[in-house]
Design a protein with these regions (language model features):
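An aromatic- and glycine-enriched ligand-binding surface/loop that stacks and positions planar moieties
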Residues: 21-88, 164, 211, 215-218, ...
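Bacterial Sec-dependent N-terminal signal peptides
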Residues: 1-29, 506-509
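Long, intrinsically disordered, low-complexity segments
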Residues: 19-21, 107-110, 246-260, 306-338, ...
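Alpha-helix C-terminal capping/termination sites
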Residues: 156, 160-163, 227, 231-234, ...
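Conserved, well-structured interaction surfaces
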Residues: 40-59, 80-161, 171-209, 409-439, ...
Length: 680
């Protein structure tokens, strides 16, 4: 009964305006008079602050956000036989019905609060006068921000749950019914479009990337149109659900669902193009990070991520959810960067050097070895072959399934060693913000849409602006057109955003998910076969992944490394090493003085019986399993953990979470879970 009462509080949405604590206070607010808490713009923003915090604490991780980047042809989850990634493996039928309740409830809680807020702000004279005059002030910003928050929550609900109830906020409903995702996304586009002109651009009116801005609202309107027009898995078990929307399909029906796209998709791509153009015009101070002012490093791509490590806002960021480091008892927040998304560490939960990093997002070896061109500065930032032992020493990652140092190569975009200084008091309290959208994402989504619509010149312009940052020159510009240009843009998005959560959705909406899943399964199987028969596998670019590598602990005065130096095995690949933990509160955890790893044979086969191997071992290098770990766990890497839900090749990708049981039980049968998801 308590669960039902709680759920009704959240979904029926009879929710008063409440006084809230500061932006990061996630405790339940006390009831207060509506007029008081909206008496000034600063008091009103406290309500929005609570909504931002509720999204961070209950929604973004309530749908296990690391599921977004671990179900693709570039990323995977490291553990074996875990239900944590059943959704990402495209096996949602294994999930319990309560798997993602907190996010579902959290979204509707936010919708209720901002909807009430919209009603109150909409009657304020300061808002009415500014809107009628076509001016932006703090009240129009708050109204637009509230409306954007509502639209954002519904977009996320459709993205992660499919067709859901819509429009019940601040009403007393005795039962609920499903609404078509297409109907909801039309409303989302409309809401973002209405909100945008009421809001400041980044840099205006004190608005930073920790708040929704005009450019973000326009980018999200474009994104909603892109998702509505793209391929997606729809239900076939609810008659009349999609009304007059006509769909084309591919593959077969499975679990009463099928892979489909609306036939008028080009209309939605045109809408997306319009909003993406507006977002670029209204981006304010957001700018692509194309230079690196640091004298000790020259990697503009990494410079963007370094801002996050420094607990600063990157100039490239359009929107990110604010966080805080540490905090008093009862006020701590979840910092999944770097814990779930970062470079792995075997460290202790507290006072580690560095603390534990689980590393839920792992990078496919076929992607790391086979898809980056020479000179692409993104490779060593995107993935790493080493982690942290937790005692101040660098350690090679292992392909045995597991977490921390086990599980394979991790992302390298977030590494506790890059903080200054690393937060060693406790795991998951780094204080790093949750990134939601950066400018390169907007640019490449716009390029994608323009390519589909045949505007190749404009598409190439955005594409090559991003590539020039990656290579530092114009020599790698793309000159393709038509279908090949679209393929090049999607590949660029893969290279640019691996580990960030975009690749899975890029493939789904472009109708390529099943095709690419089958391809990567075949690539991994061929790699394993070659490792078994030859001791290595060679990729088209000449890189070789071997069964074994040779590693050696070495001393460096500064154990934290930066740009790669191919002549120094301790500096190649680059951007690894360790922070000097002897200078931190975790100094007692540090062991030894040779904290770095020199690596030989990572990209070329060294015959274990060769003179070179013997000389390396004589020099103190240790022969270490590398590709052998993949061979020893071939089923995990080629089958059971690699997108098995679509291995048949002609079935729909099923990637949704279940709607909570309480909704189903109070809908008189009008709301059910589809896609093979649990009903109770």
């Amino acid at each position: 009964m308590n669960k039902i009462v709680k759920f009704f509080t959240l979904l029926t949405l009879c929710c008063p305006i409440v006084a809230c604590g500061d932006y990061l206070d996630t405790s339940t607010p006390e009831n207060a008079d509506d007029g008081f808490v909206t008496s000034t713009a600063s008091e009103t923003f406290k309500i929005l602050s609570w909504c931002y915090a509720n999204y961070r604490q209950n929604c973004v991780m309530g749908v296990y956000r690391w599921n977004d980047p671990i179900g693709s042809d570039a990323e995977y989850y490291p553990e074996v036989a875990s239900l944590n990634n059943a959704n990402a493996r495209l096996q949602p039928e294994l999930l319990s019905i309560g798997t993602a309740n907190s996010a579902f409830n959290g979204y509707y809680t936010i919708v209720a609060r901002v909807n009430k807020l919209l009603d109150i702000i909409g009657t304020k004279e300061e808002y009415i006068q500014a809107k009628e005059a076509g001016e932006v002030n703090e009240w129009t910003q708050l109204y637009g921000e509230s409306l954007s928050m509502k639209a954002f929550c519904y977009f996320e609900l459709v993205k992660h749950y499919g067709d859901v109830p819509y429009g019940y906020e601040n009403t007393t409903a005795s039962e609920y019914s499903l609404n078509s995702r297409f109907e909801i996304l039309d409303k989302v586009i409309e809401m973002f479009g209405e909100a945008a002109p009421l809001m400041y651009r980044l840099g205006e009116g004190g608005i930073t990337a920790e708040r929704m801005s005009r450019g973000f609202a326009e980018a999200m309107a474009g994104m909603a149109a892109l998702y509505s027009g793209g391929w997606q898995t729809v239900r076939t078990d609810v008659q009349g659900l999609y009304g007059d929307v006509q769909l084309e399909t591919k593959g077969v029906d499975e679990y009463s669902s099928i892979y489909a796209r609306r036939t008028d998709y080009l209309d939605y791509y045109r809408t997306a193009e319009t909003y993406f153009d507006q977002a670029m015009a209204d981006k304010g101070t957001a700018t692509l990070v194309t230079t690196d002012e640091r004298g000790y490093a020259d990697n503009p791509f990494q410079r963007h991520f370094q801002y996050q490590h420094d607990l600063q806002l990157s100039p490239e960021s359009i929107f990110e959810i604010g966080n805080m480091q540490g905090g008093q008892s009862g006020q701590t927040t979840s910092s999944e960067y770097p814990y779930a998304f970062g470079r792995a560490s075997n460290g202790a939960s507290q006072m580690g050097a560095p603390c534990k990093v689980f590393g839920a997002v792992r990078i496919m070896p076929t992607f790391y070895y086979g898809e980056f061109e020479d000179g692409d500065m993104r490779r060593d930032i995107t993935a790493t072959v080493t982690g942290s032992n937790g005692d101040g020493n660098e350690a090679i990652l292992r392909f045995a399934p597991g977490n921390k140092l086990d599980g394979g190569m991790t992302t390298n975009k977030w590494d506790p060693n890059r903080m200054n200084p690393p937060y060693v008091a406790d795991q998951r309290q780094s204080g790093m913000n949750w990134p939601i959208m950066r400018l390169a994402d907007l640019m490449l989504m716009r390029a994608e849409v323009k390519a589909v619509l045949g505007n190749d010149v404009a598409a190439r312009s955005d594409l090559n602006d991003v590539r020039r940052r990656a290579f530092g020159d114009t020599n790698h510009d793309i000159q393709s057109s038509g279908d090949q240009l679209l393929a090049d843009i999607l590949q660029e998005r893969k290279l640019e955003f691996a580990g960030e959560g975009q690749r899975r959705w890029d493939l789904i909406r472009n109708g390529l998910f099943v095709e690419k899943a089958v391809e990567v399964r075949a690539e991994m199987s061929q790699m394993v076969a070659d490792l078994q028969s030859k001791g290595y596998h060679e990729f088209a670019n000449g890189n070789q992944i071997p069964m074994y590598i040779w590693v050696k602990s070495v001393h460096r005065d500064n154990p934290l490394t930066y740009d790669a130096d191919p002549t120094d095995p301790a500096l190649y690949p680059g951007w690894r090493g360790q922070y000097d933990y002897s200078t931190t509160d975790a100094a007692s955890a540090v062991k030894g003085t040779d904290h770095n790893l020199a690596i030989e044979g990572l990209f070329e086969y060294i015959d274990p019986s060769s003179e070179r191997a013997k000389q390396l071992e004589a020099d103190g290098y240790v022969k270490t399993d590398w590709g052998k770990g993949i061979v020893d766990n071939a089923d995990h890497y080629c089958n059971s953990n690699l997108l098995p839900g679509v291995k048949a090749g002609n079935v729909p990708p099923r990637y949704y979470f279940p709607i909570p049981f309480e909704v189903l039980s109070h809908s008189n049968g009008k709301v059910t879970n589809g896609y093979g998801l649990a009903q109770e």
